[in-house]
Amino acid sequence: MRIIKPFAILTPQTIIQDKAVAFDKKIEAIDTVENLIKKYPNAAVEHDENSLLLPGFANPHLHLEFSANKATLQYGDFIPWLYSVIRHREDLLPLCDGACLEQTLSSIIQTGTTAIGAISSYGEDLQACIDSALKVVYFNEVIGSNAATADVMYASFLERFHQSKKHENERFKAAVAIHSPYSVHYILAKRALDIAKKYGSLVSVHFMESRAEREWLDKGSGEFAKFFKEFLNQTRPVNDTKSFLELFKELHTLFVHMVWANEEEIQTIASYNAHIIHCPISNRLLGNGVLDLEKIKSIPYAIATDGLSSNYSLNMYEELKAALFVHPNKEATTFAKELIIRATKAGYDALGFEGGEIAVGKDADMQLIDLPEGLTNVEDLYLHVILHTTKPKKVYIQGEEHVRE
């Protein structure tokens, strides 16, 4: 048993002062430090009045397999970026070997994240995710818009899914990812989602990320028309959005991006068991615009970094700073609190893990950070945490300590 007495606790919904947290694998009690010491006389006690305790972050959408990318891929617009991914994929993927993946996962923990949703296209990151201290939902992704190759792509997906399923435990879950409505044939998507239904698996899908996707699915025109003709000799989309969305009706699904979703699609998704995953830096770097949070207010959303194929960092503090600034119509102090909640409790809810809150009975997935210097108004803590934090002092996952390097 351990007891931590910080300056304040961000639960994250409220700020608690003059209290301490007693925890082992789970949070056992929140009370005055004196009462906790009486209750747990053998506990190790840490007083740190220059720190804040808040839940660990959940990063529900990232692609580990492209973690070797720094300046190889082209940013600025979605289609040139996609061409660059295809052009450099075979060079980039082998560069992130086991050591690279291990270092990437370690850096994720060191920056305050305690749970992730890892989208895996090839399964090369499976062992690293299994071995990590992180809580991981491992999304086995299916892709393929050509009906002739659907059986081959499904077989690959099924093999990867069952391989990951063998390793399930309280920290690791196997899940299903459908790449997108423009890149996965209806039949292939349905077969993969039938597996998700059979096993009660969480699902992730990129949906309405770019203007190009919107134009292609609505009209069969735009920049994707040239792309699909050139690479796959396809002249029309393989899905209409209404039929595609119906496939997810009975599933818990994370709809990633949603920048270009229309009102009808938003209403449909709002009627499902769904979360939206907002990736502001990725959306900015690929020229996709900004998610309208007012339009999607009927659907819970969480914050994620996406992968290093479309971001410079997997640090959620960087993502929160970006989110704060790309939504200028939101009042800064109240929006900062909302963002902290979206990065903790909402992310945990999206992934289905226990945690994301400093509350009795929750898993002790927490981070201890420096108190911003010169704080005069406690209610401004959320904003100053985002502005002035890059890394925590310590991170705890189910009570296990990870100290800043």
From Swiss-Prot:
- Entry EC number(s): 3.5.4.40
Record keywords, A-Z: Hydrolase, Iron, Menaquinone biosynthesis, Metal-binding
Q: Mutating S145A leads to what result?
A: 3-fold reduction in catalytic efficiency with AFL as substrate
Question: What is the residue range of the signal peptide feature?
Answer: none
Q: What class of enzyme is it?
A: hydrolase
Name the residues that bind substrate: E141, S145, H179
Record-annotated active site = E209
Q: Does the keyword Mitochondrion apply?
A: no
Cofactor details (free text): Binds 1 divalent metal cation per subunit.
Q: Does the keyword Ion transport apply?
A: no
Q: What cofactor(s) does the depicted protein rely on?
A: a divalent metal cation
Q: Enumerate the GO terms in the molecular function aspect.
A: hydrolase activity, acting on carbon-nitrogen (but not peptide) bonds; metal ion binding
GO biological process terms, alphabetically, are: menaquinone biosynthetic process
Mind telling me which InterPro entries this protein's record contains?
Amidohydro-rel (IPR006680), Metal-dep_hydrolase_composite (IPR011059), Metal_Hydrolase (IPR032466), MTA/SAH_deaminase (IPR050287)
Question: So where does a divalent metal cation get bound?
Answer: H61, H63, H206, D306
Protein family membership:
Belongs to the metallo-dependent hydrolases superfamily.
This one is known as Aminodeoxyfutalosine deaminase
